[in-house]
């Protein structure tokens, strides 16, 4: 679906098994769009992390263009 296509992750950890088990460990105000199991800490702003595991990593959220925009 579109949720999986638009999902992104900057920090993805995978096991060395075959197939690998991968998990996105990004912490942010929301979880990525394809996340089914999103756990958020009651803080302001909230700190959320996705606890889904899958056999792949999503593409990185930050490409060089976005980083330049943030720095500017």
Swiss-Prot record:
Q: Gene3D superfamilies per the record? A: Cysteine Protease (Bromelain) Inhibitor, subunit H
The UniProt entry, under SUPFAM superfamilies, shows: Bowman-Birk inhibitor, BBI
Q: Which SMART domains match?
A: BowB
Can you supply a Gene Ontology BP term from the record?
Answer: negative regulation of serine-type endopeptidase activity
What is one GO cellular-component annotation here?
extracellular region
Q: Which UniProt keywords apply?
A: Disulfide bond, Protease inhibitor, Serine protease inhibitor
Per the UniProt record, the site (Reactive bond for trypsin) maps to: 16-17
Among its keywords, does the record have Nucleotide-binding?
no
Q: Which residues form a coiled coil?
A: none
Biological role stated in the UniProt entry: Inhibits trypsin (IC(50)=0.9 nM) and alpha-chymotrypsin (IC(50)=1.1 nM).
How it assembles, according to the record, is: Dimer.
This chain's protein is named Bowman-Birk type proteinase inhibitor 2a
Q: What organism is recorded for this protein?
A: Lathyrus sativus (White vetchling)
């Amino acid at each position: 679906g579109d949720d999986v296509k638009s999902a992104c992750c900057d920090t993805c950890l995978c096991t060395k098994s075959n197939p690998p088990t991968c998990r996105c460990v990004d912490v942010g105000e929301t979880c990525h769009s394809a996340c089914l199991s999103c756990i958020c800490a009651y803080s302001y702003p909230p700190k959320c992390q996705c606890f889904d595991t899958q056999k792949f990593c999503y593409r990185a959220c930050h490409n060089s263009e976005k980083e330049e925009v943030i720095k500017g």
